[in-house]
Amino acid sequence: TRTSSSAASDVYKRQLIGIGIFMNGAQEILKSRRTIYKFSDKRVDYSELELAFEAADNAPCHKKTYPWKYYVVGRKSREMLLPTVISLCRKKEESKGNVASKQSEARAISKIMDVPVIIAVTTKLTPGDDFREEEDYAATVCSLHNLVLSLWSRGIGSQWSTGGITRHQSTYKNLGISETKERIIGFVKVGYPESIPGEKKVDARKIVEYL
């Protein structure tokens, strides 16, 4: 009937409006995201992490390999990383012709111990198939970005770190990650922002060509 047809049309219009509102919100989340370097002491609830992991697991993935894995690094596990953190700090200072000070070592330790949440992110390795590994790495980065954006949508900041500690052999050993099966692509540091950088992005017109 005309009445039922009109009602169905109204429902469809409301759905379209809802989708439009959602997409506008998503656009703002994408555009407003910033890398956070200073976190507050506010605790990040694990329920927030679970929502982010759910978003991460819905990333696009060619061939359905789902190569990503996330390790939430607790305090005791972080403490196991500290000898390597200090060693890397000293080597970095030596490469500059300096001697590592107690202050520089303390800063390096703080970057590991004082962050509310640290997540080690890995991608699956496929020995003998470089192209598969390349595709899986790309998929894992998409997954990681889903995680970051999900957190940002709820006011939680993050920083993707690829420092030397993320690639060191001892990190694999201390975190129980197999070097032959997985590659650590970085640590994601997570927490509520103490401050948000006013970072200026490149003009989008400079990164696009229509052929």
How does the language model describe each region?
Residues 56, 119, 125-173:
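Small-aliphatic-rich amphipathic alpha-helix that forms the alpha element of a beta-alpha
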